[in-house]
């Protein structure tokens, strides 16, 4: 195996590093810089530009310049340049090709293998898209690792003492926070949280919106409608943000920003740090929720956290540093370069894979729960969030209708009890199931998450061995609203979800009891005296009426009522015929049963596929 480079593919800037002489070093690019702008441009002659050269021509060529493409990874977003459309993977690949070329020039050899980092809160689709971008760029992506984990790896490489660290990673477009334990070469992630739609770009946008509003107030011209002016404002906002980390006031001076009826207009504005903090206060506050969540998930207190490590250029913002300091009660660690530490960690992981680095074990986790939709629209978890990866877990389900020959598997990711509120990762179908009464076929659904955090799902008919496998490739990513729904709504609506799930479980149990009772009455038709059959039929009708309503306690009561009159009769019938009475689990709650483990069978919401429509 040759050199395995480590790449931090960022929203605003990217960085590449490699192991040399047992140490991770950042590779300087062709322009002499240690980081490369994540910008792609297309010149008027059709030439593709990436990095600093693309950023330089952005003002004069805004329509053919692409920035912050990372925010669209894993979605069906397209970039239209002239008469061609580009996917986020293709644009990202152009940035990766630039980094690859810089690494090859530095090393003096061809580079074909890489470790690429992604935000810890990236979904399966976003991780797969990142891996695909690497492939397009001509790289064999040996591993996708989480950015906070990579940062901790770089921080902890030379640390001898055991410690617990919190990595607070606020980059250009994403935010992650992870709790990790470092112990003699072991880097173990305990919990992770974040927001895929929060980063430095959002801070820039607040400044842009403010300058546009102030200019419109003064000059009566809306700069938001001018692409060239907006690009200049974008660069000015980014520069002002950086300057306000070191000074209390900065001046934004953009001559000839636009033309008015009276001639050229100029933008000249002073912005104070206090104004900037006022404009972005809610963005800073938005980082604290996931931080508290990660701490709670790891079951740790701030007293048990030894270090708070700041990663990502946006953590240089004083208000961000002050917020995390106030929350944690600790002075953030300043011993790492927030722009480079992630790439250095990726290079170390590359060294581990290449055999250059010994005695380091990396243990990461999956950020969100994974499961499938089952009867009644319930989200049945198969892998819980913050489970160590790689991992494989399975659960056995059954059919929901008699003679059902195929099942649809609806794969989801999220934290809500109801499937409709979680994120669909994909769907696939298992067909060829031999016709049988419902509840008889046993279908094993297996989830496998590899070391890259990419999900593979299979469904297998235990009787025939017929199996269908799929690597989940969803076409949509998680927006900020969806992320908030998955985490915050899970708590805000916990009671509502719990009651709704309890109602569905009660209805499922009642439905199962109705089905079993009617089947029993049919099987013993003519053998049960009318005076004994009547109470069963009466209780059955009462149960059907209750099950049509929303009263959970009444449904449970009527289900129990059928059990009380039915079981003695069945036992008597079996004694008369010399058979054994059925087990006590007849009509058991299918929803609750499925949560017991791999040996249980639950009714899953599957749809029978008409043969003519296949």
UniProtKB/Swiss-Prot annotation:
InterPro entries: ATPase_NBD, Chaperone_DnaK, Heat_shock_70_CS, HSP70_C_sf, HSP70_peptide-bd_sf, Hsp_70_fam. One of its GO terms (molecular function) is ATP-dependent protein folding chaperone. The keyword Ubl conjugation does not apply. The modification Phosphothreonine is found at residue 174. Induction: By stress conditions e.g. heat shock. Pfam families: HSP70 (PF00012). Keywords: ATP-binding, Chaperone, Nucleotide-binding, Phosphoprotein, Stress response. Residues 578-589 have a biased composition (Low complexity). Residues 576-614 are annotated as: Disordered. The keyword Chaperone applies. Acts as a chaperone. Belongs to the heat shock protein 70 family. This is Chaperone protein DnaK. The gene is dnaK.
